[in-house]
UniProtKB/Swiss-Prot annotation:
Function summary: Required for maturation of 30S ribosomal subunits.
Native source organism of the sequence: Rhodopseudomonas palustris (strain BisB18)
Source species taxonomy: Bacteria, Pseudomonadati, Pseudomonadota, Alphaproteobacteria, Hyphomicrobiales
Pfam families in alphabetical order: DUF150_C, RimP_N
Source species, domain of life: Bacteria
Name of the molecule in the record: Ribosome maturation factor RimP
Amino acid sequence: MTDPTPAAVDLDLLAEPRLVVEPGLGARVAAVAGPVLQGMGYRLVRIKVSGELGCTVQIMAERPDGTMLVEDCEAISHALSPVLDIADPVERAYRLEISSPGIDRPLVRRSDFERYEGYLVKIEMAVAVGGRKRFRGLLGPLQGDAVLLAREGARDGEDPNSLLPLEDIASANLVLTDELIAESMRRGKIAEREMKRELGVLPPPPPHAKKSDPTKSNAPKAKLPKAKLKAAKKPPPTNTKEHRLAAAERKRLGQTDPTEGD
């Protein structure tokens, strides 16, 4: 079987930089793996180096449309292993793992936040926003260099909407929900069907067929709750019939209204 190659690659998406990157050893591995992945038509999502049961280097990758198949992981492993052996960024024995981002994936690029608008996320900030660093809620739209989030569990009278600067995000992950699972399955089926057509296993679609786009989410746009503001109390009426009768009686008796002349 021919190694799969992502078709009709969006070059802008492919070259889009990550907002969340690794420090130290992870950064050294990313410097080697990133260009190889991009040359193959894939994007680097995350590098994770762990020392449990020996050293494991996990490289999370995806197609520019956010999908990833088992065949993609195999192709990346075959291409990347010899390059890492020569560059030797780890400098000790390790086990290489190539994986997809998973359903509850990390969000590391602007396009990730755009693609998953309307889904439940958890975000940890490197810099506190409004006195807190951890947020969980519905992902809203991007506003310039920040993303809007409708927090869960906001108190009565508290604005649940938080504007989080993208450059200050330490980590952001989707939260597993039924809607997210359904969306992930939909995208996976589209990617698998396209790969089979590339390999000639399936015939091409008829010219009039509507092509599904895995980069477009089926999630409804997030309806961010509005801040709950306490309504100001209306002042009591001052020109009722009772007020006019009382004023006339005071005038007859030669009394003055203490509020007059204010």
